Structure formats: structure tokens, C-alpha cells
């Protein structure tokens, strides 16, 4: 008996016993008959490859597989079932009897495989027909081993095939009648139908949570960025407003005025002489001091730079506007900014 056939028998038996919810027995599946027809043909073709085939010493009893179709149609379903059941059971007995007469050989191995196929057919018919009392049908005796394999093929193509095609649908319908008890597969099916809804709800919840989390974080970032925009604009405007004032506060020694008052000198303003090393800002009257708050970034007295760095104070500062020139003073045609930037112009101014 081959391993595949043994596994098929075990599968059929477990299916019929452990799962009572399956309505149709294995014999109702047409693939089973087709498989057995192919296997019987392959097994009979292997018989020609055995070198030691001899007639049996004792003839074996085999069922008569020939029948009349007209007579078969007139019989009842119960009679047909008993006839087929009896023929298969008698064939199994003949195969076992023929194998018992042989020792280990190629023919004995093939007869062992044939007995496995006959048992498989008998088990499938038992699941469909139940246990039947075999009637006293027609029998034949044979010594030729080839007749045993041919009897099985003719039985499958004849009586078994007509029984499954004609009476099979009616017998399978009786086996599939619903019972009052609710099968377990139904409850399992209902449970599985509910699972997609729960899964979709869970996915929707997770998506909404992630959307809310992402939306709130993005909103906070936008609000923070929006709050920073006015401050950046204010700083930019302050920097632009402070630029003229810083340009006008050029720290260059020009007649002691740092370029604030063009063409004026401390003598014309009535200020005392400034000793060397002192700051010119201290010598100016209070009404001429520049209107900006002192910053730690301004250089100490006596040290001058061309352009002072931009202040870092966040408070807005008014641009430095010089007071109008004194009409009594003579206006200098040279710009104090250019004089402070170029020492050559400073020398020319002093010479004048």
C-alpha cells in the first residue's frame, strides 16, 4: 500500500468522523472516482514489467463485473447498492487470497497495492451506503493474475460509476439534510463576519488619533512660527531705522565734534579748551549731546573707530538727528563723513 493512498484513507476517515458538519461523504466527490480510475490503470500497466508472472496454483473467486444496462435500470436503489457493495467486498477477498499464494515478488507487491485501492473504494461506499448485506450475486473463478486487475477496472467503470452517477445525487441529498442543532461552523462564520467591522473600527480610531496628534502638533508649530514673524519684522525695521543714526555717529576726530556738526568748532560754540586725552563728548553742552543711551559696546574715551557696531538692545532707538547749524558759523563744503573716513581730507581741513 502506497503512502499516498494511506494518507488519503486517513484523511477521509478523519473527515467523516471528526467533522460532523460536512454533509457530503467522500463518495459524493467525483474526483475520488477519477483518481481511482487513473491509479488502477497505472497499476495494471506495471504488471507487464514484472518478470515472474505465473498462473496461480489455486483459482480465486472474483465477482462478475459484466451487467446489462436495461436490467440495471429496472432494479431498485437498495438492490443496486447491495450489488455494488457485494462485488467490491468479494474482489477484496479474491485479491487477498491470490497474494497469500505468493512469496515476496513483484506480483505480490502489486497485489498489495491493489488491495489498498479496493479498501479505499469499500470505505467510500460504506460512508455513502452504510453497511450492506452482500447478496448472492454471480461470481467467476480465475487463475490468471491479470484478470484480477482487469476485474477492478471494469467494476469501477461499470457498476460503481453508474451507481454514483444515477443514485449518488439522491443518496448525497439524504446525507446533507440539516439538523436542529446549530453547527459550530455557523457560529465561527458569524464571528469571522464581525471581525472586519471591529478591525475597521480600530483602524479608524487609530487614524483619528494620529490625525489629531499630527494636526495639533502642526497647529502649534504654525502658531509659534506666526508669533515669531512680528518680532523678526520689528527687528528688521529697527535695524533699518538705526542705520542712518550709526552713519551719522562717525567717531572721527574732526574739530572735536565727531562729525556731528559740520564746519563748527568748540571755540565757536563757546566751549572751553579740551585738554588732550579727554573725551570730546564731555566738553559738549548738554543740549548738544547725541540722544542715545550709552552702551557697553561703545569704545572707551580716547579710542575711536570708523563705524560703531550695531547695538544689540531690543528696545527701539530713535535715529540720531543733528541740530540745525548755527547761521553765524561758516559752513564747510566738505562732508564730515568723508573727512572722518579719509585722513587725507582731515589734514587738508586742518591746514585750511
Curated annotation (Swiss-Prot):
Primary localisation category: secreted
Q: Does the keyword Heme apply?
A: no
Q: Which UniProt keywords apply?
A: Cytokine, Disulfide bond, Glycoprotein, Hormone, Secreted, Signal
Glycosylation is annotated at: 185, 197, 206, 234, 255, 332, 347
- InterPro entries xref list: 4_helix_cytokine-like_core, EPO/TPO_CS, EPO_TPO, Thrombopoietin
Describe its function. Answer: Lineage-specific cytokine affecting the proliferation and maturation of megakaryocytes from their committed progenitor cells. It acts at a late stage of megakaryocyte development. It may be the major physiological regulator of circulating platelets.
Which family is this sequence assigned to?
Belongs to the EPO/TPO family.
Q: Would you tell me the protein name for this molecule?
A: Thrombopoietin
Amino acid at each position: 500500500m502506497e503512502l499516498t493512498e494511506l494518507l488519503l484513507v486517513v484523511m477521509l476517515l478523519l473527515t467523516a468522523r471528526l467533522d460532523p458538519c460536512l454533509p457530503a461523504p467522500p463518495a459524493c466527490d467525483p474526483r475520488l472516482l477519477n483518481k481511482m480510475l487513473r491509479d488502477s490503470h497505472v497499476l495494471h500497466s506495471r504488471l507487464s514489467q514484472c518478470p515472474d508472472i505465473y498462473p496461480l496454483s489455486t483459482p480465486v473467486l472474483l465477482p462478475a463485473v459484466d451487467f446489462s444496462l436495461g436490467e440495471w435500470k429496472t432494479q431498485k436503489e437498495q438492490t443496486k447498492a447491495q450489488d455494488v457493495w457485494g462485488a467490491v467486498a468479494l474482489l477484496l477477498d479474491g485479491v487477498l487470497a491470490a497474494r497469500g499464494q505468493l512469496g515476496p515478488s513483484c506480483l505480490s507487491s502489486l497485489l498489495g497495492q491493489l488491495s489498498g485501492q479496493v479498501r479505499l473504494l469499500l470505505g467510500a461506499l460504506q460512508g455513502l451506503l452504510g453497511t450492506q448485506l452482500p447478496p448472492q450475486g454471480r461470481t467467476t473463478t480465475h487463475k490468471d493474475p491479470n484478470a484480477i486487475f482487469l476485474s477492478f477496472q471494469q467494476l469501477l467503470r461499470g457498476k460503481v460509476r453508474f451507481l454514483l452517477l444515477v443514485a449518488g445525487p439522491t443518496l448525497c441529498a439524504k446525507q446533507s439534510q440539516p439538523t436542529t442543532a446549530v453547527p459550530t461552523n455557523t457560529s465561527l462564520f458569524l464571528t469571522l463576519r464581525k471581525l472586519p467591522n471591529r478591525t475597521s473600527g480600530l483602524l479608524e480610531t487609530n487614524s483619528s488619533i494620529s490625525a489629531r496628534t499630527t494636526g495639533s502638533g502642526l497647529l502649534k508649530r504654525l502658531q509659534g512660527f506666526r508669533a515669531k514673524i512680528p518680532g523678526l519684522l520689528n527687528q528688521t525695521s529697527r535695524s533699518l531705522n538705526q542705520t542712518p543714526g550709526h552713519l551719522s555717529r562717525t567717531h572721527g576726530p574732526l574739530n572735536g565734534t565727531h562729525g556731528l556738526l559740520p564746519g563748527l568748532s568748540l571755540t565757536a560754540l563757546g566751549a572751553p579748551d579740551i585738554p588732550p586725552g579727554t573725551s570730546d563728548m564731555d566738553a559738549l553742552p548738554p543740549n548738544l549731546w547725541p540722544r542715545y543711551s550709552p552702551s557697553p559696546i561703545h569704545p572707551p574715551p580716547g579710542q575711536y573707530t570708523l563705524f560703531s557696531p550695531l547695538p544689540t538692545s531690543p528696545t527701539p532707538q530713535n535715529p540720531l538727528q543733528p541740530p540745525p547749524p548755527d547761521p553765524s558759523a561758516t559752513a564747510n563744503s566738505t562732508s564730515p563723513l568723508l573727512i572722518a573716513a579719509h585722513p587725507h581730507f582731515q589734514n587738508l581741513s586742518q591746514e585750511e
